[in-house]
Amino acid sequence: MCFTYILELNLGNKALNVAIRMAPNQKYPFNTRSFFTEDGKRPLRGGVELWRGYFQSIRPSMGKMIVNLDISTGLMYKPGPLINLCLDFFGKPDPNFLSPKRGLPDRERLRLQRFISGLRIITSHGPSGRAQTRVIRKLSSAGASGQKFTMRENGEISVADYFRVHARKTLKFPDLLCVEVG
């Protein structure tokens, strides 16, 4: 009897915690128990920022339930174009730094890949042309002009040529790394 009562209280407490987190989690970035706002954000080097966050939970106390609210801090990627984030990571201003043809060492490409792997990005370059959220998997070892893939009907084509022919878009930096997304 007592064990069942404790389980029911625990389940009720979990439900209340989910309920108080629902609205902030729909409006702000969050992790398991905290949500974060841009208020008071602090830029750091390397393409990241510190954001103020709030941890909240409902706790049982003697004869009542209390809301616990604590301050937390989260590390966020700098918002904006992906190319800017990559340049900030290296502290470089010239986009051509990200070109394997122009000497980007493979170890630096792998460092950048570890930094952005798993990052969710919004792109409108898909077949539909609508904005889609994608997850970065890895970086190509060649630039868009050297990275090739096979199309069913047309054979092998470079990423840069694909965009030029099929999307009618000439890439501004065809020698930069490609991002492989899932």
Q: What is each model feature region?
A:
Residues 1-182:
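Argonaute/PIWI-family RNA-guided endonuclease scaffold
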